[in-house]
């Protein structure tokens, strides 16, 4: 068996990365793609590797030189018109090579783990196209297969239909052809197709024609979770660098992204909590039905959004400002009330108190913390520890603040997930404590809409709210987020049911976590469960282990925080933990 790599393309979409180099010279985590794949091919006992080169071909040949002479025999074919042709011409230049031996055919812009090549080489079937179930990041040629893994259709980019994605598999651009298949089927069709359609086409089009006109001997070989990525642009390169980072670096590579984990479909994010039982399918269907209109329309200004949010919260429009997530709330508060000073969070000191291992605190603890501060933030329920103070205890602190000229800012984003907590967001409470209380809530979090970034800040002090509004851009949330706010009241009973489901699942999840000997599980009434590691590992070490198993978690010191997700997702995590 031999290998052929098509490496003649210019890779224009990679911009500066391919300004002076071909795509396979691009580095992922300090290793060039060409070095990686040659080493992988070198472990397969192949007779030779044939590289079809073009753009910056001499530079590639000079780089390879004789460094792999003891690994694999390397030969070259030149495509002198690489800038006027596509990969069908590069492959046509190698047609005689294809007919000489069984061949692994690869493109030069893919990165994959070792098992990918082992999977296709070890499979006894002679003619295979490696494929993977469609995911949102995939682009290019798709195939449809039957239950025998026969390819019934090649779907070019122009024929792609999003409504059919459940039936699509993406070609990984790794093929295995027997020399008989190349000689008797593929190469004759390749010659004919090139003569009719020209040389600015893709070689997959030939396979598409074969499936239409010929009982093809080519079968699909679906991957089973093996990692791979196609690198077409700088964003792809960034994602591939994260996917293929080494064990110690991988967790930090993911963590520094902060979010956007939808780009990694295999990853389940337990680092940030959100309501997994809301919105309902019906609410999402309503949002989808209006999506085209919403993305083509400007959102309303602050006053309209505050009116809608106030209606949902049960408070007057003049007491509410709508923000683009909690991050915007904290930013505007620092610029208005705190004049650039750091916000003080109540739990920060308690985290350092070894005499309080469960991080429990009550009204008296908060008052003591407040003694030398003009204002502070109380997260209730606390997202880190899961501690939750009853409404009467929180109001005890607010009363004390009022008597001492201080301000308590309460973040109650998780209050609907708690057993004991109760919202402070009402006209009566806000008006009574207009000088000493401000309330914040992340609607995105409680309603399971983290991608829409919606938060509210409320106070009975209308002048303060007015100042906050003036410091926030009028169009600070988009039309889709505004629409979600607008229709929420229609689904309020579903929302309440979702919170009950959340509490029930958290109880089950906590009980299951308590069965692991390496955890001390701290009781929680928030959207996450805090676990102390008792096996000597640090949180970072533990999270590094989890990320290798496609689980993202967060923590500090010896404490790991695990968000409560759906039963299905939680069971995935429990299965991972059981195998440790």
Where do the protein language model's features map onto the residues?
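Conserved PLP-binding catalytic core of the aspartate aminotransferase-like
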Residues: 502-507, 513-549, 564-566
